[in-house]
Curated annotation (Swiss-Prot):
Its EC number is 3.1.26.3. One of its GO terms (molecular function) is double-stranded RNA binding. Disulfide bonds: none annotated. Its main location: cytoplasm. Belongs to the ribonuclease III family. Homodimer. This is Ribonuclease 3. Pfam families: dsrm, Ribonucleas_3_3. Digests double-stranded RNA. Involved in the processing of primary rRNA transcript to yield the immediate precursors to the large and small rRNAs (23S and 16S). Processes some mRNAs, and tRNAs when they are encoded in the rRNA operon. Processes pre-crRNA and tracrRNA of type II CRISPR loci if present in the organism. Mg(2+) binds at residues 41, 114, 117. It comes from Photorhabdus laumondii subsp. laumondii (strain DSM 15139 / CIP 105565 / TT01). It catalyses: Endonucleolytic cleavage to 5'-phosphomonoester. HAMAP family: RNase_III. Residues 6-128 form the RNase III domain. The lineage of its organism: Bacteria, Pseudomonadati, Pseudomonadota, Gammaproteobacteria, Enterobacterales.
Length: 226
């Protein structure tokens, strides 16, 4: 792996690994090696959820559990993590098998998001909980400063449905138009048909639900509600 690219990634992450093999494992998709990043992803997912929940709890002392849950969901969802990955230029650093490389896996949101979680797990194992908490909060500083409780934190499908109902319009319809990948690593493509939008809106995700949410979010943007 290109050391220049790896060093640039570590600068963008704000962390230099002592155990280099942990970094390489975090960047390794299961299509590339049996020593892949899924266990690190499992660990990182839990750590990220805790750090964000703790930050929201202390930032919003008067906000109820429901609003905090919705804010956390916004901050840890796949497309937010994929945005972080693109800020880190993470796609250039991924270790992918030939099939994933050919299909553009280095651009796929689900792979980028999973790798960010794996990096969180790897940094924790390479350091301690205080270090990874500090790093996550630095990554999320702008997003934490900008987020606020309220209807905007409801998931996209709920917001789209409420908007259409409020305007006495038909509910959206969601149709699976493509499923690719093996059972353990699938990508779903959904078309969402919405009254007021001429063409179906497309969303992709690692599950049908995530793809529907992504399509609903795109529909909201076209309706200028995002």
């Amino acid at each position: 792996m290109n050391p220049i690219v790896i060093n640039r990634l570590q600068r963008k992450l704000g962390y230099t690994f002592d155990q280099y093999d942990l970094l390489i494992q975090a960047l390794t998709h299961r299509s590339a090696s049996s020593k892949h990043n899924e266990r690190l992803e499992f660990l990182g997912d839990s750590i990220l959820s805790f750090v964000i929940a703790n930050a929201l709890y202390h930032r919003f002392p008067r906000v109820d559990e429901g609003d905090m849950s919705r804010m956390r969901a916004t901050l840890v969802r796949g497309n937010t993590l994929a945005e972080l990955a693109r800020e880190f230029e993470l796609g250039e650093c991924l270790r992918l098998g030939p099939g994933e490389l050919k299909s553009g896996g280095y651009r796929r949101e689900s792979i980028l998001a999973d790798t960010v979680e794996a990096l969180i797990g790897a940094i924790f194992l390479d350091s301690d909980i205080q270090s990874i908490e500090r790093i996550i909060l630095s990554w999320y500083e702008t997003r934490l400063n900008e987020i606020s409780p309220g209807d905007k934190q409801k998931d996209p499908k709920t917001r789209l449905q409420e908007y259409l109902q409020g305007h006495h319009l038909p509910l959206p319809s969601y149709l699976v138009v493509m499923v690719r990948g093996e059972a353990h690593d699938q990508e779903f493509t959904i078309h969402c048909q919405v009254s007021g939008i001429e063409q179906p809106v497309k969303g992709t995700g690692s599950s049908r639900r995530k793809a529907e949410q992504a399509a609903a979010e795109q529909a909201l943007k076209q309706l200028e509600l995002e």
